[in-house]
Amino acid sequence: MQMKATILIVLVALFMIQQSEAGWFGKAFRSVSNFYKKHKTYIHAGLSAATLLGDMTDEEFQEFMQDIEQAREEELLSRQ
């Protein structure tokens, strides 16, 4: 009898843990989903930029970074 009670308690505990984890997973999924819906334009732009940068050779990437640095310096000079 004591063994059956122990097994029952363990099964109930496992069920409660499973339910609480399922609730946590659902909340996390909704949170990520809401974040994506709010920021999908920026996410797509970031993925496009990452794809373009990933396809560049090292020399093209260095030129790209130099162009960005030059544009930043020109912007700083124009503010002065």
UniProtKB/Swiss-Prot annotation:
<protein>
    <recommendedName>
        <fullName>Styelin-C</fullName>
    </recommendedName>
</protein>
<dbReference type="Pfam" id="PF17562">
    <property type="entry name" value="Styelin"/>
</dbReference>
<feature type="signal peptide">
    <location>
        <begin position="1"/>
        <end position="22"/>
    </location>
</feature>
<feature type="propeptide" description="Removed in mature form">
    <location>
        <begin position="55"/>
        <end position="80"/>
    </location>
</feature>
<keyword id="KW-0027">Amidation</keyword>
<keyword id="KW-0732">Signal</keyword>
<dbReference type="GO" id="GO:0005576">
    <property type="term" value="C:extracellular region"/>
</dbReference>
<keyword id="KW-0929">Antimicrobial</keyword>
<dbReference type="InterPro" id="IPR035578">
    <property type="entry name" value="Styelin"/>
</dbReference>
<comment type="function">
    <text>Bactericidal against several Gram-positive and Gram-negative bacteria.</text>
</comment>
<feature type="modified residue" description="Leucine amide">
    <location>
        <position position="53"/>
    </location>
</feature>
<feature type="modified residue" description="6'-bromotryptophan">
    <location>
        <position position="24"/>
    </location>
</feature>
<keyword id="KW-0964">Secreted</keyword>
<keyword id="KW-0044">Antibiotic</keyword>
<dbReference type="GO" id="GO:0042742">
    <property type="term" value="P:defense response to bacterium"/>
</dbReference>
<keyword id="KW-0102">Bromination</keyword>
